[in-house]
């Protein structure tokens, strides 16, 4: 789709009548378990950043791991950034990803349950099983909205914000969320579920406009859905009904915090039209940066600088 058409494009993604009720019940069920935040200092050898191994209770009270990185010796209260990672990745090593702590933020990087063996390592299992699924997580538990994998992930992600806000070093009124690709999609879900974030940044976000994405790109991970439906031909309608409860377009409609989006015109993994579908639907103040000559890497470090500027404005 040409860039000029993207500005006119609107997603046709519909939302279930009980979308809000489903997510309210999901979060009520999740919050029935104590948050149980545990923080343990990690000896990394770093001199400018203090790192902590954090565990909190996510979906069903199941433990979720995260790294907390803060400027060395900081006592706060600091503005905080909760970060979600891309598909197949985990929280990585404690000495990685130092940008946000270097900018004076408390930085909580959430592990993604059941991932963390594709390009960075993770430490959080997904104890819940599922029925038949295509390799990967896109169709795990897709038989119903209750069992779908991303129900658990999005519940974890909301609890990550709550865990960050519980920390003495964090100013709970100045918590922003950020992520790229899958992490960007998770950030948009949190933006729709947590009404009082300071700001949101979604770089080349995944998990947006599933129905469109699943038919316009041959690239994984969206293609996992296509391969599943190539085998389960009769299930297209029910699968897309389930996915509508997890679509970034529907979460974006409920977002209210200032948001920064980015997209890349040569991105085959998260096609620009799917990103624009979420961008145009977003309910709060918003801006989008287009990288005309990039693929799924988007703006790389430039995306971080865009987010930093937005977060500082929101936390001033």
Language-model segments: which ranges?
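N-terminal targeting or regulatory segments adjacent to alpha/beta-hydrolase or S9 domains
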Residues: 1-50, 103
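Short beta-strand element of the alpha/beta-hydrolase
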Residues: 66-70, 76-88, 107
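Cap/lid segment of the alpha/beta-hydrolase catalytic domain
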Residues: 92, 98-99, 105-155
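Gly/Ser-rich "nucleophile elbow"/oxyanion-hole loop immediately N-terminal to the catalytic nucleophile
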Residues: 136-180
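Acidic catalytic loop of the alpha/beta-hydrolase fold
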Residues: 265-270, 297
């Amino acid at each position: 789709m040409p860039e000029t058409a993207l500005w006119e494009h609107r997603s046709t993604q519909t939302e279930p009548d009980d979308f809000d009720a489903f997510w309210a019940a999901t979060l009520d069920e999740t919050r029935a378990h104590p948050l149980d935040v545990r923080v343990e200092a990690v000896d990394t050898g770093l001199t400018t950043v203090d790192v902590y191994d954090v565990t909190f209770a996510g979906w069903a009270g199941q433990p979720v791991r995260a790294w907390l990185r803060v400027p060395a010796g900081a006592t706060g209260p600091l503005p905080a950034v909760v970060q979600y990672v891309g598909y197949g990745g985990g929280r990585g090593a404690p000495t990685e990803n130092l940008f946000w702590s270097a900018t004076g933020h408390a930085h909580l990087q959430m592990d993604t349950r059941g991932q963390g063996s594709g390009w960075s390592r993770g430490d959080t299992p997904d104890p819940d099983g599922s029925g038949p699924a295509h390799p990967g997580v896109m169709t795990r538990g897709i038989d119903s909205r209750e069992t779908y994998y991303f129900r658990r992930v999005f519940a974890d992600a909301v609890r990550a914000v709550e865990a960050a806000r519980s920390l003495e070093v964090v100013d709970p009124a100045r918590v922003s969320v950020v992520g790229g690709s899958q992490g960007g999609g998770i950030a948009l879900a949190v933006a729709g579920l947590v009404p009082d974030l300071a700001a949101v940044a979604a770089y080349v976000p995944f998990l947006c406009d599933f129905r469109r994405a699943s038919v316009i790109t041959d690239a994984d991970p969206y293609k996992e859905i296509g391969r599943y439906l190539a085998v389960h031909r009769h299930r297209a309608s029910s699968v897309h009904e389930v996915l509508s409860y997890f679509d970034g377009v529907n979460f974006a409609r409920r977002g209210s915090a200032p948001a920064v989006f980015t997209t890349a015109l040569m991105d085959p993994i998260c096609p620009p039209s799917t990103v624009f579908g979420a961008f145009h639907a977003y309910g709060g103040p918003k801006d989008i940066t287009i990288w005309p000559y990039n693929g799924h890497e988007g703006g790389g470090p430039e995306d971080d600088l865009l987010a930093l500027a937005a977060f500082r404005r929101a936390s001033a």
